[in-house]
Regions:
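Conserved tyrosine-mediated DNA breakage-rejoining catalytic core shared by Y-recombinases
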Residues: 1-2, 25, 34-72
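Catalytic-site neighborhood detector that most strongly recognizes the C-terminal catalytic loop/helix
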Residues: 54-58, 133-158
Length: 163
């Protein structure tokens, strides 16, 4: 897996870790590039949140820094040096080849992973995900929210037990 592969190249290690950070925060590449922990995080009930503004749209977003993301932040002393998007995606392509991934791996895939695998698969409402991603309309978030078969099956079981 991308998390466990042994990488000898320092640049590949950093990009891998930053990609995983994106998977657990939903940040786009440009928001990761501009991320400043001291300037845009707040703490509430012992959980750190990114309280920021999307670079692309200027829309406010508010998302938790989940434990795996916080571990990565600590590893890099809360500061990332993010390469250009081209270099970032080139590194991800190399990593994908090393782990035998057939589909292309890009920084934007991390944002989709956050939306589907991390958030929606754990029954977080789409309206909450929309706020986390900094979308002004839930209809934009629905592009990310391809309904997962497992979610349909789980809810069907719940409905069958009620009816």
């Amino acid at each position: 897996s991308i998390r466990n592969i042994e990488l000898n190249d320092r640049q590949l290690q950093k990009v891998r870790d930053q990609f995983i950070f994106q998977c657990y925060t939903g940040l786009s590449w440009v928001d990761l590039y501009m991320f400043d922990y001291d300037r845009c995080t707040v703490e509430h009930n012992g959980v750190a949140y990114i309280d920021g503004e999307r670079i692309k749209t200027g829309t406010k977003f508010y998302t938790p820094i989940l434990t795996p993301a916080m571990e990565i932040l600590k590893k890099y002393d809360y500061k990332f040096t993010v390469p250009t998007v081209q270099s970032f995606n080139r590194s991800l392509k190399i990593i994908a080849e090393l782990i035998g991934l057939k589909k292309p791996l890009t920084s934007h895939i991390a944002r989709h992973t956050f939306a589907t695998t991390v958030v929606l698969a754990n029954d977080v409402p789409i309206e909450t995900l929309s706020k986390m991603l900094g979308h002004t309309k839930v209809s934009v978030t629905q592009v990310y929210a391809k309904i997962l078969n497992s979610s349909v099956e789980k809810h069907a079981e719940k409905l069958n037990s009620i009816i």
